[in-house]
């Protein structure tokens, strides 16, 4: 028999290997499968997702549960480990919080910045490192990301904000592993994850993890091994928010 054909992105038609079993390995960060995806997914012989969260997301959209399997992602536990080299973080002080990801509405950095700068001030011995990018890693995108971060800090604590450091460079996996080991806690107030790779890497590196208690990271982060934050689900029907976050639309 022909070997399965595993798809990581939607092909144009079924002409590549028309007789081979077709498996789609996919994810999404909301509680519904996007409607434009449904017909393509239904045409697959098998659908694999990273998390129970997406198993439920796909099922409630009408895809038969027996068509959906779960194949969690693996990480290099030798690289992402408490043991290994650290890095010197210039201008950091005291207890170091680390957050990372693309600076989008879904990652919800604004809520994290608000909580941090309202809880602490420049008198506290703490640092928040924001390892983020916004659209890319060029100088232009780094400037845009840094400006968004500065604006958020200024809005929520214009007088005496605690220390916030921004790192917008693209780095190697080894440098990222060293950054985890050089921090004291990983925190991200995400609105939704289909995978939650940063959480997995941080936890494997031995960091306490503060996270939203919903979506894919709930597969491996529990109240027993992390610090889940309470959340509230809302319908995304505000036009102004839809304009800011089009990638979250399901139709």
Tell me what each language-model feature is.
Residues 1-62, 175:
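Extended catalytic core of nucleotide-activated donor transferases of GT-like folds
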Residues 35-36, 74-90:
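Acidic anion/phosphate-binding donor-loop and adjacent secondary structure
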Residues 45-56, 64-82:
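Donor nucleotide-sugar binding/catalytic pocket of nucleotide-sugar-dependent glycosyltransferases
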Residues 90-107, 113-116, 128-130:
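Conserved donor-binding/catalytic core segment of Leloir-type glycosyltransferases
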Residues 139-174:
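Nucleotide-activated donor-binding/catalytic signature segment of Leloir-type glycosyltransferases, i.e.
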Residues 177-183:
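Short alpha-helical donor nucleotide-sugar binding micro-motif in glycosyltransferases
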Residues 191:
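Aromatic "clamp/platform" in nucleotide-sugar-dependent glycosyltransferases that forms part
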Residues 208-211, 221, 227-229:
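Short hydrophobic beta-strand element within catalytic cores of glycosyltransferases
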